């Protein structure tokens, strides 16, 4: 098996994880050359208890004027208490092209660091992304 070829694409938006004493913090990073008008992050999910599923609604966050290279905190996960939860993040990102709507896959315990959108317009692995012009 040959080694994987180096990635020729550049991420525009990605998630970066930073471990602190009490939690794993997750940041949305603007890797473009432009200031984003706004980045809105929405957390959803659920936990099962016996035969019931209980929905989870996290804080909805909105950041304005997110500069190139800047990361904004979108979530924090507790490595012990959050293990039984299934989380999913969605984003609305306003930029010069229009508004991107981005949805991560649902994951148990936390959301992993990952590329959300590449410079060729393709979404990251297991990510849904669509652009609304305007």
Q: Each predicted region: which residue ranges?
A:
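Acidic, serine/threonine- and proline-rich intrinsically disordered appendage/tail regions
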Residues: 2-8, 98-134
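Exposed beta-strand and adjacent loop surfaces of beta-rich binding modules
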Residues: 23, 36-38, 86
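Short acidic, flexible loop segments centered on an aromatic residue
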Residues: 33-53
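Intrinsically disordered, low-complexity Pro/Gly/Ser/Thr-rich segments with frequent PxxP/GP/PP motifs
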Residues: 48-84, 88, 97
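A short beta-strand motif that forms part of the nucleic acid-binding face
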Residues: 43, 78, 104-106
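Beta-strand-rich extracellular modules
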Residues: 92-94
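Beta-sheet-dominated interaction scaffolds and their linkers
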Residues: 2-23
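Short, well-ordered beta-strand segments enriched in hydrophobic/aromatic residues
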Residues: 24-30
């Amino acid at each position: 098996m040959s080694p994987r070829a180096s990635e020729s694409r550049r991420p525009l938006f990605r998630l970066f994880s930073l471990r602190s004493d009490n939690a794993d913090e997750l940041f949305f990073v603007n890797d473009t050359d432009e200031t984003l008008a706004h980045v809105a992050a929405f957390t959803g999910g659920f936990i099962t208890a016996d035969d019931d599923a209980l929905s989870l609604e996290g804080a909805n966050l909105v950041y304005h004027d997110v500069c190139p290279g800047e990361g904004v905190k979108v979530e924090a996960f507790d490595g012990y208490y959050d293990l039984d939860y299934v989380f999913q993040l969605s984003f609305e990102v306003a930029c010069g092209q229009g508004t991107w709507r981005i949805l991560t896959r649902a994951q148990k315990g936390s959301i992993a660091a990952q590329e959300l959108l590449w410079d060729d317009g393709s979404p990251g692995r297991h990510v849904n992304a669509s652009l609304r012009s305007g």
